[in-house]
Amino acid sequence: MHIALCDDSRTELSRLTFLLEEYRLTRDGSLTYDIFTNATDLLETIPVHHFDLLLLDILMPGITGMDAAREIRQTNSTIPIIFLTSSSEYAVESYRVNAADYLLKPLDADKLFPVLDKLLADFKSNAPYILSLIHI
């Protein structure tokens, strides 16, 4: 599973990359990720680079994570999006962009890993179907 992680805070990115590395070491060695410090760079990369999951901070300068999700949904209605934020204020709005989950910071393994486990299981169960479409 390939993840795009987008957060403007270097501190949060350090914490999240530590958690993703821990997840890779303890649960799924095939997990990979790319890091983005703003939504503009993420939006420019998505059309040319495949991601299986997006982890988006909501409150970022410029294009917010919610704005990025709206733009992504115009061309990709299926990619799972998990919002990571320190505010519960946008939880209801996250349903409008079909978010897979909404996690409040600070994150730890107890919050993040069960969500990743579920999405990874969904991803793996859909993989044979996706591969069959590629070979058609």
Language-model-detected regions and their locations in the chain:
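Non-catalytic signal-transmission and effector/linker regions of two-component phosphorelay proteins
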Residues: 1-4
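Conserved acidic carboxylate
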Residues: 7
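Two-component/phosphorelay signaling modules centered on CheY-like receiver
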Residues: 10-34, 74
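CheY-like receiver
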Residues: 41-127
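Residue-level detector of beta-strand face positions
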Residues: 129-131
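Conserved small/polar residues in nucleotide/adenosyl-binding loops
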Residues: 134-136
